[in-house]
Protein backbone atom coordinates (compact mmCIF):
# COMPACT_ATOMS: atom_id res chain seq x y z
CA UNK A 1 0.00 0.00 0.00
CA UNK A 2 1.42 3.37 -1.04
CA UNK A 3 1.76 6.09 1.60
CA UNK A 4 0.55 9.64 1.01
CA UNK A 5 2.51 12.18 3.07
CA UNK A 6 0.70 15.40 3.95
CA UNK A 7 1.72 18.39 6.07
CA UNK A 8 -1.06 20.53 7.52
CA UNK A 9 -0.29 24.15 8.38
CA UNK A 10 -1.85 23.97 11.84
CA UNK A 11 -1.75 22.02 15.08
CA UNK A 12 -5.51 22.50 15.48
CA UNK A 13 -7.03 19.00 15.61
CA UNK A 14 -10.10 20.17 13.66
CA UNK A 15 -7.95 21.15 10.68
CA UNK A 16 -5.69 18.09 10.87
CA UNK A 17 -8.71 15.77 11.14
CA UNK A 18 -10.43 17.47 8.19
CA UNK A 19 -7.35 16.86 6.04
CA UNK A 20 -7.06 13.26 7.23
CA UNK A 21 -10.74 12.64 6.47
CA UNK A 22 -10.76 14.33 3.04
CA UNK A 23 -7.52 12.80 1.81
CA UNK A 24 -8.50 9.31 3.02
CA UNK A 25 -11.76 9.68 1.14
CA UNK A 26 -10.01 10.89 -2.03
CA UNK A 27 -7.22 8.30 -1.88
CA UNK A 28 -8.73 5.19 -0.26
CA UNK A 29 -6.00 2.95 -1.70
CA UNK A 30 -3.28 4.90 0.15
CA UNK A 31 -2.06 4.78 3.70
CA UNK A 32 -2.33 8.33 5.04
CA UNK A 33 0.49 10.01 6.95
CA UNK A 34 -0.83 13.40 7.98
CA UNK A 35 0.93 15.70 10.45
CA UNK A 36 0.31 19.24 11.58
CA UNK A 37 2.95 21.89 12.18
CA UNK A 38 2.74 25.40 13.55
CA UNK A 39 2.62 27.67 10.53
CA UNK A 40 2.29 31.45 10.72
CA UNK A 41 -0.45 33.03 8.65
CA UNK A 42 1.20 36.43 8.30
CA UNK A 43 -2.23 38.04 8.68
CA UNK A 44 -4.28 39.22 11.67
CA UNK A 45 -5.43 36.61 14.19
CA UNK A 46 -8.96 37.35 12.98
CA UNK A 47 -8.87 38.14 9.26
CA UNK A 48 -11.68 40.55 8.40
CA UNK A 49 -11.62 40.30 4.59
CA UNK A 50 -11.71 37.53 2.00
CA UNK A 51 -8.40 38.77 0.62
CA UNK A 52 -6.52 38.54 3.93
CA UNK A 53 -8.12 35.17 4.73
CA UNK A 54 -6.95 33.74 1.39
CA UNK A 55 -3.50 35.22 1.94
CA UNK A 56 -3.31 33.58 5.38
CA UNK A 57 -4.07 30.13 3.96
CA UNK A 58 -1.47 30.54 1.21
CA UNK A 59 1.16 31.82 3.64
CA UNK A 60 0.65 28.81 5.92
CA UNK A 61 0.89 26.32 3.05
CA UNK A 62 4.01 28.01 1.66
CA UNK A 63 5.62 27.97 5.12
CA UNK A 64 4.99 24.23 5.35
CA UNK A 65 6.62 23.65 1.98
CA UNK A 66 9.61 25.83 2.90
CA UNK A 67 10.15 23.81 6.10
CA UNK A 68 10.15 20.51 4.22
CA UNK A 69 13.32 18.80 3.07
CA UNK A 70 13.44 16.78 -0.19
CA UNK A 71 14.15 13.60 1.77
CA UNK A 72 10.84 14.09 3.63
CA UNK A 73 9.06 13.19 0.36
CA UNK A 74 5.93 15.13 1.17
CA UNK A 75 3.10 14.87 -1.33
CA UNK A 76 0.87 17.75 -0.23
CA UNK A 77 1.09 20.89 1.88
CA UNK A 78 -2.36 22.00 2.99
CA UNK A 79 -3.49 24.94 5.10
CA UNK A 80 -6.74 26.57 6.12
CA UNK A 81 -7.47 30.10 7.27
CA UNK A 82 -10.80 31.07 8.76
CA UNK A 83 -12.02 34.61 8.34
CA UNK A 84 -15.01 36.91 8.18
CA UNK A 85 -16.16 39.57 5.79
CA UNK A 86 -19.09 41.87 5.24
CA UNK A 87 -20.88 40.71 2.10
CA UNK A 88 -23.84 42.10 0.18
CA UNK A 89 -26.17 39.93 2.29
CA UNK A 90 -24.45 40.69 5.60
CA UNK A 91 -21.51 39.41 7.64
CA UNK A 92 -20.37 35.82 7.29
CA UNK A 93 -17.55 33.52 8.30
CA UNK A 94 -15.79 31.12 5.93
CA UNK A 95 -12.43 29.49 5.39
CA UNK A 96 -9.93 29.36 2.58
CA UNK A 97 -7.88 26.25 1.89
CA UNK A 98 -4.55 26.33 0.05
CA UNK A 99 -3.03 23.18 -1.40
CA UNK A 100 0.50 22.85 -2.75
CA UNK A 101 1.45 19.69 -4.66
CA UNK A 102 4.83 19.66 -6.37
CA UNK A 103 4.88 22.89 -8.39
CA UNK A 104 1.12 23.35 -8.57
CA UNK A 105 -1.33 25.02 -6.24
CA UNK A 106 -5.06 25.13 -5.77
CA UNK A 107 -7.04 27.49 -3.55
CA UNK A 108 -10.61 26.91 -2.50
CA UNK A 109 -13.17 28.43 -0.18
CA UNK A 110 -15.77 26.93 2.10
CA UNK A 111 -19.42 27.81 2.23
CA UNK A 112 -20.21 31.03 4.10
CA UNK A 113 -22.00 30.94 7.44
CA UNK A 114 -24.09 34.07 8.06
CA UNK A 115 -23.11 35.78 11.31
CA UNK A 116 -25.30 37.88 13.57
CA UNK A 117 -24.41 41.55 13.18
CA UNK A 118 -23.61 41.80 16.92
CA UNK A 119 -20.97 39.07 16.60
CA UNK A 120 -19.48 40.77 13.55
CA UNK A 121 -19.31 44.03 15.51
CA UNK A 122 -17.33 42.28 18.27
CA UNK A 123 -14.92 40.98 15.64
CA UNK A 124 -14.58 44.44 14.11
CA UNK A 125 -13.59 45.61 17.60
CA UNK A 126 -10.62 43.22 17.51
CA UNK A 127 -11.94 40.05 19.12
CA UNK A 128 -11.50 36.56 17.65
CA UNK A 129 -14.55 34.57 16.55
CA UNK A 130 -13.73 31.57 18.74
CA UNK A 131 -13.49 33.73 21.86
CA UNK A 132 -16.72 35.57 21.05
CA UNK A 133 -18.55 32.28 20.51
CA UNK A 134 -17.15 30.82 23.76
CA UNK A 135 -18.39 33.88 25.62
CA UNK A 136 -21.85 33.91 24.02
CA UNK A 137 -22.51 30.18 24.17
CA UNK A 138 -20.65 29.43 27.43
CA UNK A 139 -18.29 26.99 25.71
CA UNK A 140 -14.56 26.47 26.05
CA UNK A 141 -12.14 26.45 23.09
CA UNK A 142 -14.93 25.90 20.55
CA UNK A 143 -12.52 26.67 17.70
CA UNK A 144 -10.86 23.30 18.28
CA UNK A 145 -14.25 21.59 18.26
CA UNK A 146 -17.35 22.33 16.17
CA UNK A 147 -16.63 26.05 15.91
CA UNK A 148 -19.14 28.81 15.27
CA UNK A 149 -20.46 26.63 12.47
CA UNK A 150 -21.43 23.88 14.89
CA UNK A 151 -22.94 26.28 17.40
CA UNK A 152 -25.02 28.24 14.89
CA UNK A 153 -26.25 25.15 12.99
CA UNK A 154 -26.99 23.02 16.08
CA UNK A 155 -24.09 20.79 14.99
CA UNK A 156 -25.74 19.92 11.68
CA UNK A 157 -22.53 21.26 10.16
CA UNK A 158 -19.16 21.67 11.90
CA UNK A 159 -15.77 23.14 11.20
CA UNK A 160 -14.54 19.65 10.33
CA UNK A 161 -17.35 18.95 7.86
CA UNK A 162 -17.03 22.37 6.27
CA UNK A 163 -13.24 22.18 5.97
CA UNK A 164 -13.44 18.62 4.64
CA UNK A 165 -15.84 19.67 1.88
CA UNK A 166 -13.78 22.75 0.96
CA UNK A 167 -10.63 20.62 0.69
CA UNK A 168 -12.31 17.96 -1.44
CA UNK A 169 -13.55 20.62 -3.86
CA UNK A 170 -10.16 22.34 -4.01
CA UNK A 171 -8.49 19.00 -4.81
CA UNK A 172 -10.28 18.74 -8.20
CA UNK A 173 -7.27 20.08 -10.20
CA UNK A 174 -5.06 17.35 -8.69
CA UNK A 175 -7.61 14.59 -9.23
CA UNK A 176 -8.04 15.50 -12.91
CA UNK A 177 -4.85 17.35 -13.93
CA UNK A 178 -5.52 16.68 -17.62
CA UNK A 179 -8.61 18.90 -17.37
CA UNK A 180 -6.89 21.84 -15.70
Sequence positions of predicted segments:
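Anionic-ligand binding patches
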Residues: 45-180
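N-terminal polybasic phosphate/anion-binding patch
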Residues: 2-74
Amino acid sequence: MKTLNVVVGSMNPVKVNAVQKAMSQLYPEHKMHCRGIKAPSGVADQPMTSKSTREGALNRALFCKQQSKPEDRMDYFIAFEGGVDLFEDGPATFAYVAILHHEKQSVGCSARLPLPRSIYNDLADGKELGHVMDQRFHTHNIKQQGGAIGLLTNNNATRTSTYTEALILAMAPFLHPDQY
